[in-house]
């Protein structure tokens, strides 16, 4: 255990931030999973709605500093491509 008051505070802050980041990362994974399920089932309407939500959430987490800009851009690009592919084939 830390002896300095500032070190104890840092430990508390790290714990809080870790929990918060874990919540956001889990939320991102769930949103992406829902979108991929809709794509696999070839449900265009549901996929487009899920894409809208995913796009909004990913960009929000970039502004909060949870994700890096290029990571979110890569995820959005790949998700867009998968939805576009099923929309064209339908």
UniProtKB/Swiss-Prot annotation:
Keywords: Ribonucleoprotein, Ribosomal protein, RNA-binding, rRNA-binding. One of its GO terms (biological process) is translation. The keyword Transcription does not apply. GO terms for molecular function: small ribosomal subunit rRNA binding; structural constituent of ribosome. One of its GO terms (cellular component) is cytosol. Pfam families: Ribosomal_S20p. SUPFAM superfamilies: Ribosomal protein S20 (SSF46992). Residues 1-22 are annotated as: Disordered. This is Small ribosomal subunit protein bS20. The gene is rpsT.
């Amino acid at each position: 255990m830390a002896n300095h008051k500032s070190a104890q505070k840092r430990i508390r802050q790290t714990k809080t931030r870790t929990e918060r980041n874990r919540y956001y990362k889990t939320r991102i994974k769930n949103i992406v999973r829902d979108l991929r399920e809709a794509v696999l089932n070839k449900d265009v309407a549901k996929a487009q709605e899920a894409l809208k939500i995913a796009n909004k959430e990913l960009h929000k987490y970039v502004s909060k500093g949870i994700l890096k800009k290029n990571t979110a851009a890569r995820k959005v690009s790949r998700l867009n491509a998968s939805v576009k592919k099923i929309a064209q084939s339908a």
